[in-house]
Every structure is written in structure tokens, then in C-alpha cells.
């Protein structure tokens, strides 16, 4: 049903307009008690065998919504209603900013992919913190907050900008993510270099601990798929050294070669980060490499090209405790999370593993032992 609607309506609309139209409908449904109860019963069934403990948190399942869809913490209940067991909001910057000029979001339908150069358009950390503080949750879900650099802030002042966001948002986050991997903010990816990343993550950790004294807010870093293997290793080692709680692999890619893209060259050539199905293999490679390096010492989150339950299962076998999706949600529609959780439950039942936790990293460990 949704795929017919997508072809007849959404495909003909500007992608950003279609995004906000869907966003409004989800928010509206979540505000109507009878409707949200019905939708949640249909799309967010619980599978007790998928219960997950990660980052010191208990979740109904491992699959959640990646950052980028709900930038301003407006539709958390709506996304939980659709079956996402954690919702990562943002990216949120220290100060509000409009993002890059439109047109800035493109669908590569033939590739089941998106290209975006949104540029961290968001209302800023103060506004988002106020919204989170006032939130009265309808559905129990884990809320991650993804923070990034304000565009006008120079690279050498980035740490202070991230600290500002941390001080405002940490108290309202179940976990925090430092995003240094978007290709759409000039200079941001330079912060992935360990000599820049170490002081940045240290400053954010200290700010979170200083701001929230009643609990330890888990801190993760999100990395790009375009890092060289040795740089992936360096980030992994740094994460362990600094006592980070996790790494999210991966963000969008600036690469176009070698991805087998079928869309029109003019569309493929649009500037920005590419997400969706073509990212699948490289994201999985990075995830496996991270797990081989860090094992179970930190939590890994797999994202990038997760279209279905098999993709999510492969992420878990590679080393991900949590898995996220976004681009495929645009193509698959509201039953996306339900299908993944149902498929994961079936795969776990058919596997040799007694629990989901047992399956985490099993394939990577097997390859290492071969």
C-alpha cells in the first residue's frame, strides 16, 4: 500500500516537502490517543527475545531511528509508535542555523538511496533542550541526542561549541553522540583525526559529567565510511583509551565510484552525503573492523544501508549491539521497523544462539579464528 502511495504521490513531490508532509502526519497520529494506540499495536509489537541491554540501558529491541529524520525532537513519540526502539534526534548544533540553500535533498530511487547536503538545519541546542525538558512521553523509548558543530564556528573553537550543546542537552539525553562525520559542514570531518578528536571528546565527556551528576550519560562518536582502515583503527583505539561508551558506524559517504549506482549521472553528481543501499557493504566492513579491534569493550551501533531484517542481522553478527536505519524508511514506509524486528526474531529463533547478545559479533569472531 505504502509503495503504491510512494510511487503516486511522494515520488512526484520535492523530497524535502515530502519529508515534512510525512513528518506532520506521524506527529498528528501520535497526538490522537485512539489512533496512536491502534498504530502502535499494529506496528510496534514487542518480541521478548529481542530485549536488548546496551549503554547501561534496557530497550525492547535493537533497532532504532538514525539521526537526521527528527532534527528538533518533535516526533519522538510518533517514531516510537512506528516501532523504533530508540530514536536518535539531531543533529543539533550549539546555535540555531537554517542549513544549506535548497534544493538540498535528492532521491536516487533506482539505487534506493538519498543524497543530502542539508547542513545541520536545526533550531539550536537551547530550543531543543527546552522541548525535551517539557516533553511528556506517551511511549517508553530511548532517546539519543546527536550533536554537531555550528557552521560559523571555526574549527579551533569547535570543542567549546560542542560543550555548549552538551551542557544544555546532556540532562535530557539517554545517550549523547558526537557527530564529526557529516560531509556537509566545512571542516567537520577534519575533527575525526585523533589529534583533534581526543581533546574534543575529552571536553564533551567532562561537560556531560559536570552537568549531570546523578548518572553517567553514555557518550558515543559517529564516524564516516570514508575513513581509511588505519584511521578506523585509530578511532577504535581512541574510543577505548578515553572510555567512550560506543561508536556509530557509519554516517553518509562522499564517494560515488565503485558503488554501482544506476541513477542519472546528474543526480549522482549532486554534492552531499549519500546514504541508503549503496552504502551497505562499506558500512558493514567498517563495523566488522571496529569489532575486531574493540570486541565487547564498547557498544557498536551499525547504520548505513540497512534495508531489511537480513541487513540488520548481518550488522549484529558483525558486532553491532544496536542497529539503526533512516533512508530505507523513506522507501519502505511505516511498517519498516516492524518488519525488521519480526525478521530478527525469526532469524534468532533459527540460529544457534540462545540470545541476541550471544549473536553480537559472532561472524567477526569466527572470521578472526579461521
Curated annotation (Swiss-Prot):
Keyword annotations from UniProtKB, A to Z: Cell membrane, Flavoprotein, FMN, Membrane, Oxidoreductase, Pyrimidine biosynthesis
Active site, UniProt feature: 182
Name of the gene this protein is made from: pyrD
Binding residue positions for FMN: 67-71, 91, 146, 179, 222, 250, 276, 305, 326-327
Descriptive protein name: Dihydroorotate dehydrogenase (quinone)
Keyword Metal-binding in annotation: no
One GO CC term, this protein: plasma membrane
Protein's job: Catalyzes the conversion of dihydroorotate to orotate with quinone as electron acceptor.
Primary location class: membrane
Amino acid at each position: 500500500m505504502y509503495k503504491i502511495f510512494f510511487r503516486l504521490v511522494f515520488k512526484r513531490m520535492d523530497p524535502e516537502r515530502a519529508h515534512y508532509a510525512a513528518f506532520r502526519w506521524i506527529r498528528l497520529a501520535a497526538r490522537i490517543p485512539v489512533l496512536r494506540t491502534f498504530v502502535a499495536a499494529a506496528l510496534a509489537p514487542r518480541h521478548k527475545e529481542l530485549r536488548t541491554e546496551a549503554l547501561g540501558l534496557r530497550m525492547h529491541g535493537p533497532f532504532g531511528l538514525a539521526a537526521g529524520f527528527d532534527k528538533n525532537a518533535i516526533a519522538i513519540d510518533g517514531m516510537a509508535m512506528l516501532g523504533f526502539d530508540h530514536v536518535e534526534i539531531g543533529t543539533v548544533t550549539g546555535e540555531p542555523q537554517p542549513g544549506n540553500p535548497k534544493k538540498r535533498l535528492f532521491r536516487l530511487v533506482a539505487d534506493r538511496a538519498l543524497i543530502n547536503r542539508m547542513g545541520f538545519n536545526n533550531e539550536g541546542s537551547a530550543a531543543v533542550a527546552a522541548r525535551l525538558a517539557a516533553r511528556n512521553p506517551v511511549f517508553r523509548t530511548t532517546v539519543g541526542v546527536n550533536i554537531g558543530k555550528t557552521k560559523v564556528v571555526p574549527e579551533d573553537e569547535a570543542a567549546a561549541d560542542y560543550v555548549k550543546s552538551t551542557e544544555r542537552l546532556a540532562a535530557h539525553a539517554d545517550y549523547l553522540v558526537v557527530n564529526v562525520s557529516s560531509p556537509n559542514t566545512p571542516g567537520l570531518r577534519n575533527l575525526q583525526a585523533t589529534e583533534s578528536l581526543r581533546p574534543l571528546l575529552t571536553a564533551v565527556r567532562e561537560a556531560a559529567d559536570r552537568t549531570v551528576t546523578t548518572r553517567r550519560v553514555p557518550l558515543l562518536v559517529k564516524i564516516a565510511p570514508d575513513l581509511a582502515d588505519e584511521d578506523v583503527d585509530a578511532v577504535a583505539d581512541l574510543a577505548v583509551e578515553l572510555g567512550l561508551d560506543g561508536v556509530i558506524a557509519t554516517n553518509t559517504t562522499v564517494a560515488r565510484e565503485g558503488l554501482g549506482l544506476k541513477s542519472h549521472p546528474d543526480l549522482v553528481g549532486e554534492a552531499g552525503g549519500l546514504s541508503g543501499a549503496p552504502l551497505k557493504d562499506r558500512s558493514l566492513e567498517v563495523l566488522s573492523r571496529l569489532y575486531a579491534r574493540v570486541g565487547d569493550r564498547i557498544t557498536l551501533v551499525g547504520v548505513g544501508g540497512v534495508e531489511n531484517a537480513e541487513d540488520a542481522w548481518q550488522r549484529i553478527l558483525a558486532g553491532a549491539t544496536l542497529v539503526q536505519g533512516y533512508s530505507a524508511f523513506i522507501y519502505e514506509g511505516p511498517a519498516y521497523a516492524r518488519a525488521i524486528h519480526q525478521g530478527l526474531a525469526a532469524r534468532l529463533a533459527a540460529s544457534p544462539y540462545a540470545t541476541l547478545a550471544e549473536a553480537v559479533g559472532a561472524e567477526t569472531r569466527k572470521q578472526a579464528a579461521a
